[in-house]
From Swiss-Prot:
One of its GO terms (cellular component) is plasma membrane. InterPro entries: TMEM205-like. Keywords: Cell membrane, Membrane, Transmembrane, Transmembrane helix. It comes from Aquifex aeolicus (strain VF5). It comes from the Bacteria. This is Uncharacterized protein aq_125. It is found in: Cell membrane. Its main location: membrane.
Length: 132
């Protein structure tokens, strides 16, 4: 039962992250001015990463008996979410107004970390599916 709940939480987070990252954010930048789209994304993504910390943390606890690979991926996933939420995102906010070139560099790093988070989440989902 615990693993099914972990699977549900991770699947929800994977769907949410994929939807925001690959549909909502790009669409905002297509239909709104860059500043407006950026203002929306600045509000949405910290909530997304914060929710990820909670969901991935709970799933890590619930799936603690799912093997070393699941735990390793879960710990790395959680660390990357914490890095995004508490280091990268605040750094991006500070740089946007002061050094746009450096902001773009950190934005690229942030996108890479987000992709890694989604892939790690997918890996844990697959582990739980095929473990059954």
């Amino acid at each position: 039962m615990k693993e099914k709940l972990a699977l549900a939480l991770l699947s929800f987070f994977l769907g949410l992250g994929s939807f925001f990252s690959f549909y909502v954010a790009p669409t905002l930048f297509k239909v709104l001015e860059r500043q407006q789209a950026g203002a929306v994304v600045e509000k949405v993504f910290p909530v997304y990463f914060g929710l990820g910390i909670i969901l991935v943390g709970i799933s890590l606890f619930l799936g603690r008996d799912s093997g070393k690979l699941f735990l390793s991926l879960g710990i790395l996933n959680l660390l990357l979410l914490l890095l995004q939420e508490f280091i990268v995102i605040p750094k991006l906010h500070g740089l946007k107004a002061t050094n746009y070139e450096l902001f773009l560099k950190y934005h690229g790093v942030s996108m890479g970390i987000n992709l890694a988070i989604l892939l790690l989440t997918l890996g844990k989902v697959l582990i739980l599916i095929f473990k059954r």
